[in-house]
């Protein structure tokens, strides 16, 4: 009798996943696109592969927390339909808010959105006593429920800022500010590759894929495997450092010639009076409005955004500049860290869209509310379903948040991006292993602040205060908007038909 809720919940959860793609996936790729290590097209392709992979292989931990760690399931044992309907409302309101926030370039927290929705739904149906406000845990941070999640909202940006500033400060001191930074980078590149691979391999191995038993990997085994993989990566890269060095030098030698050629081409275009309208008119008829919209989004001119905004242009102009050749070394490293960040993002944030739908699906399948019920093999297609939604969201609307974080918040270069992405990935995967649904937005913003603050520690002139304030305001509004709208929508569906009935009398 609740099949319609399963179908509607699936649709709304897919929309919520699209909203996450439009808003939160930019957290993984904004720095790479902003530093021009990746194009928007490349970011979309990588997101499609690694967001979905992270969700399917590693997302079950956090999905369980979103699904079972906020609301007390025992309160719903006698009313499974209400929990299903309430979870559907959570998905609908989360998706709605994420698209609104993306429209106004507010990188909000999807974790805030989902948790706030679950709280609002539970309080309306069963009261505040059925919300798990506090729960003692045996592992760090030893606090579960809503209290543990709220604590993570403070800890995650703080830790991300500390780690990213430490990473970038070390890189800047040892390499970037050296007179022979290019040579130093050449010598240290295998070590940097090995270190990056080791860190990411450790957290991926230690967290593991639950379906194949890697989530039980002991700490010492994870350390041994990750160190071995990192060392092997450094050894493999070492023979190619000479070729990489030659390619970078050749690339920068010919860059001036390319710029001259582009100028001549632009002059010819102007002389021939060829404008955008002429070009658009020559497109094939099969290119419909949706294709054109997507194409415009992934080909947006990022340089124009910087030039047209006075404050953003000042931040970019005043930022410390390092050798172009040295920065080029960090591009390949940044792409790798972006992939790891994307992988961890898929593991963490797909749960925000799929957690409530997982509750709907299990209740409908088992015909009862039982906290011990697991998704089993169904987790893979459900998490994959969410990963695909995230990719579509990035494709349709992700450029908005990429502009806000990757360009407008501060100046991002490949070396800065490596520190930001690596710090964010470490905090996110650690939290996911501990079954804490961290805010990816908080981690990314915190890591970005940590790097940008090093430009001028006293005045923080490397940060765009207006963007930062708008972001914080968005975080506050998230709890109010999603929690309130979910409560209203849930109340309308659960209580309106039964005013004066048994359900109201029982509450």
What is the role of each PLM region?
Residues 1-268, 276-507:
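Alpha-helical transmembrane segments and immediately membrane-proximal extracytoplasmic
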